[in-house]
């Protein structure tokens, strides 16, 4: 049954959905990696596809940018379309010297400056963590590919243009690997809805050195992350 944001029918989505932020990246992933991809959503240009990968039905759909956007789509996928697993595949900005541009950060947990999870729990803190059943297969897939990856904490921010110049230093001192804009919200929705979620992000920008990928480099560098997610998802 269609929702306000997803015009799909029951059964249109697979158990596992990969979610890049950019709907055009979802289209690229579906057309590049999935056999017989079918467009299952295009409301507001948020493209979603379902197809086959190595004998397993998988879906890929854009999430948009930020906690509110991914929260809407994740909630509807979990509660209305019987999706079991959502894997965010996106970009992040490194705040650690050892986490280089093009490296992959697998978000075991995510802090945030957003209040969404506190609102869920009457303003108490919430431990926004990934599901281990997704985390372990992704780590194993990254190891098999001999990818450069790091497992640890992300920081999810509502502000792309940071208002607190000292925050990066404080986060880094607490071991946070990178900054992005969705993971903590996704983990909160998954917990609320009884689903499983994981975020893995390719470092597109280094917030300490200023190094960043060009648009073309982003496209090619992100392929490693996508292929790791696909390989792992077959075994979920």
Swiss-Prot record:
Entry's EC annotation: 2.4.2.1
Residues at the catalytic site: 205 (proton donor)
PROSITE patterns recorded: PNP_UDP_1
Site (Important for catalytic activity): 218
Known function: Catalyzes the reversible phosphorolytic breakdown of the N-glycosidic bond in the beta-(deoxy)ribonucleoside molecules, with the formation of the corresponding free purine bases and pentose-1-phosphate.
Family in the record: Belongs to the PNP/UDP phosphorylase family.
Protein name: Purine nucleoside phosphorylase DeoD-type
Species for this entry: Hahella chejuensis (strain KCTC 2396)
Gene of this entry: deoD
